[in-house]
């Protein structure tokens, strides 16, 4: 079962109308955007953003930890209201409204030990290499749908990094703002980023289920998010999490 976090997001302001709806945000660990403290409470950039969105919009939010793939299924059925840190895909857009504007972007990149990443200069150099990736993630076209590549999916970024560190995989794809942060905290294996950099960024959104019973509140959240992005508040919140 998912764990509901009542710490930061569960403290509702007294001015909110009694009986007002509480929207459920489903997500999983993805440092530095979403991390777990020793008390199992979430913290990180996305949590700071959600806290400010709650304050600006007056909409109560509660956070529930759910594996990423299951979270997407809950968005598809309307069991969950929101997800944060979402990359856009055509398949997801069938059941998720991507609230505008996007609030952050990262660059996809390939990582491994020096001998593994040194030959990677172009996309074509990925042929014949086993590449680790996180299941249910979106990176860039044509990689995501390229059936000619030898791709090995795992459930989480943490597991993927450990497999590369231990030599079970020689190469992995990730997003720089997540993997660079992880490596800045610990990189005993000496993992490096390949020179080849895909040209398209991974743009991150707050998404609302099209089947949410609170779908009408989407524009209110989008307006609050837009104000945060345009004022530079999101950029300010992000600075402590940048390696």
Q: What kind of feature is each model-predicted range?
A:
Residues 60-67, 149-156, 160-163, 194-196:
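Short beta-strand-to-loop elements that line the ligand-binding cleft
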Residues 14-17:
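N-terminal signal peptide c-region/cleavage motif recognized by signal peptidases
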Residues 44-56, 117, 124, 129, ...:
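Extended ligand-binding regions for polar small-molecule ligands
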Residues 27-29, 105-108, 184-222:
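Periplasmic-binding protein-like
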Residues 20-95, 153:
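Extracytoplasmic small-molecule ligand-binding "clamshell" domains
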Residues 69-81, 158-178, 185-186:
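Short helices/loops that flank or line small-molecule/ion binding pockets
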Residues 51, 63-125, 136-138, 192-199:
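Acidic, polar ligand-binding/catalytic clefts
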């Amino acid at each position: 079962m998912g764990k509901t976090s009542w710490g930061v997001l569960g403290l509702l302001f007294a001015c909110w109308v009694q009986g007002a709806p509480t929207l459920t945000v489903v997500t999983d660990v993805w440092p530095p955007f979403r991390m777990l403290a020793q008390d199992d409470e979430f913290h990180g950039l996305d949590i700071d953003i959600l806290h400010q969105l709650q304050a600006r919009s007056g909409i109560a939010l509660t956070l529930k930890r759910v594996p990423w793939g299951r979270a997407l299924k809950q968005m598809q059925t309307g069991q969950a209201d929101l997800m944060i840190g979402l990359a856009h895909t055509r398949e997801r857009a069938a059941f998720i409204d991507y609230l505008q504007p996007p609030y952050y972007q990262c660059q996809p990149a390939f990582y491994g030990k020096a001998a593994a990443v040194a030959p990677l200069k172009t996309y074509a150099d990925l042929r014949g290499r086993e590449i680790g990736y996180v299941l249910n993630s979106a990176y860039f076209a044509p990689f995501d749908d390229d059936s000619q590549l030898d791709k090995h999916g795992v459930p989480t970024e943490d597991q993927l990094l450990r497999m590369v560190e231990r030599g079970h995989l020689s190469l992995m794809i990730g997003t720089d703002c997540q993997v660079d942060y992880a490596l800045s905290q610990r990189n005993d294996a000496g993992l490096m980023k390949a020179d080849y950099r895909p040209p398209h960024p991974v743009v991150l959104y707050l998404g609302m289920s099209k089947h949410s019973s609170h779908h009408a509140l989407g524009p209110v959240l989008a307006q609050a998010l837009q104000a945060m992005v345009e004022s530079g508040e999101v950029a300010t919140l992000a600075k402590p999490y940048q390696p």
